[in-house]
């Protein structure tokens, strides 16, 4: 089974650059305090690291 990571949106995309909004959409987040469980891959980690002020890692599984 692949490793997974649970992330939660903690920041609003209002008044943020379009690239940051697009990154949130790419992660599947669009509303405050929503969570998603994603595969723990380098590309997902890179997206999370590009917007650390808007998302937090809730849990790492696997």
From Swiss-Prot:
The keyword Ribonucleoprotein applies. InterPro entries: Ribo_uL30_ferredoxin-like_sf, Ribosomal_uL30_bac-type, Ribosomal_uL30_ferredoxin-like. One of its GO terms (biological process) is translation. GO terms for molecular function: structural constituent of ribosome. Keywords: Ribonucleoprotein, Ribosomal protein. Pfam families: Ribosomal_L30 (PF00327). It comes from the Bacteria. GO terms for cellular component: cytosolic large ribosomal subunit. Part of the 50S ribosomal subunit. Belongs to the universal ribosomal protein uL30 family. This is Large ribosomal subunit protein uL30. It comes from Roseobacter denitrificans (strain ATCC 33942 / OCh 114).
């Amino acid at each position: 089974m692949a490793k997974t990571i649970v992330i939660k949106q903690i920041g609003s995309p209002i008044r943020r650059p379009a690239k940051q909004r697009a990154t949130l959409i790419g992660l599947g987040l669009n509303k405050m305090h929503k969570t998603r469980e994603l595969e723990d891959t380098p590309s997902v980690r890179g997206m999370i690291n590009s917007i650390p002020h808007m998302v937090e890692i809730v849990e790492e599984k696997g």
